[in-house]
Amino acid sequence: MVIGGEDFSLKGGSPNAAGLRKSIYTEELALKYKVPLIRLHEGAGGSVGGTNQEKSNRPTSDAVYTPSRFISLANTLGEVPVATAALGPVAGLPASRLVASHFSVMTESSLVLIAGPKVVKRALNIDVTKEALGGPEVHLKSGVINNFAKTEDDAFEQIKTFLSFVPDNAWTFPASISTTDRIDRCDDLLVDIIPKDRRR
């Protein structure tokens, strides 16, 4: 498997040109070797300093002929299992990569935000806390995140369990597990367990 993500201890996990290339590289690596991709996220969105061109005359954006940075992301979703974990604050571009997965889990101390409270205040003149904007309670209800984990270790175990149910790629079968459960067994409990709201 391939493991990637953002590290908050390095420039707040803010993506710059090199960081984005690394994210794309992990996706391309998973596609090349046809193995599951795991992303561990704890990072902010783009930094103002990262887009500042005063220090260099070189352009910071991609050339027009450069392939979209989301092509490899879309391809992984069609070819290999993608599991992600929010292990702290996740905002901006890292948040989009977090939710673009087959399985996502969020720890108690994590946040998933497109933008923070200051941006909301400026745009809508509404005071809101980070937790009310993007905490686990919000996203478990909205369907942005699949599961909740009390700790990082719990999140890792949930990812491990998820990966045990799926094949390594679209060209292989999942592992066959012996069971005493009857093939023709029906359970009415499933009618209530599966939410009618497709976003949950």
Predicted regions and their residues:
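Intrinsically disordered, low-complexity segments enriched in small/flexible residues
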Residues: 1, 7-12, 150-200
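A structural preference for short, pocket-lining loop segments at secondary-structure junctions
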Residues: 1-7, 22-53
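Conserved catalytic cores of soluble enzyme domains
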Residues: 35, 41-171
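Conserved N-lobe beta3->alphaC-helix segment of eukaryotic protein kinase catalytic domains
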Residues: 15-16
